[in-house]
């Protein structure tokens, strides 16, 4: 379950409000992935579908994980027990 957002624009999207920060083509897929993240009971639940490409991040994002929205955009978050924290949508390019 999502317990907190790092980005207000990501939270707006999760609440089904439009955000000008993200391209229109990203909204629908991002919302679907945010709903998957919210429904996950354990981190491994996010391995399905394989297109999520669940990754453990390193460097300045150590301690975070990500799932893909598309080749450019990711949802980054911290996972603890059965909850996601500091959820944000990030442009990886």
Language model segments and positions:
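A short, surface-exposed loop/turn module that caps and links secondary-structure elements
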Residues: 41-65
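Generic structural signal for well-ordered secondary structure
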Residues: 3, 27-30, 46-50, 68-70
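Glycine-rich, flexible loop/turn motifs
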Residues: 1, 9, 18, 42, ...
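Amphipathic alpha-helical interface surfaces
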Residues: 6, 30-33, 53, 57, ...
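Conserved phosphate-interacting/catalytic interface
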Residues: 37
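Arg/Lys-rich, positively charged N-terminal/basic patches that mediate binding to nucleic acids
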Residues: 1-33
């Amino acid at each position: 379950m999502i317990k907190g957002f790092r980005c207000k624009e990501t939270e707006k999207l999760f609440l089904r409000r439009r955000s000008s920060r993200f391209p229109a083509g990203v909204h629908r897929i991002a919302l679907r992935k945010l709903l998957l993240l919210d429904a996950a009971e354990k981190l491994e639940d996010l391995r399905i579908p394989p297109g999520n490409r669940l990754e453990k991040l390193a460097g300045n994002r150590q301690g975070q994980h990500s799932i893909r929205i598309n080749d450019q955009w990711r949802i980054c978050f911290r996972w603890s027990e059965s909850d996601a924290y500091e959820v944000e949508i990030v442009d990886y390019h």
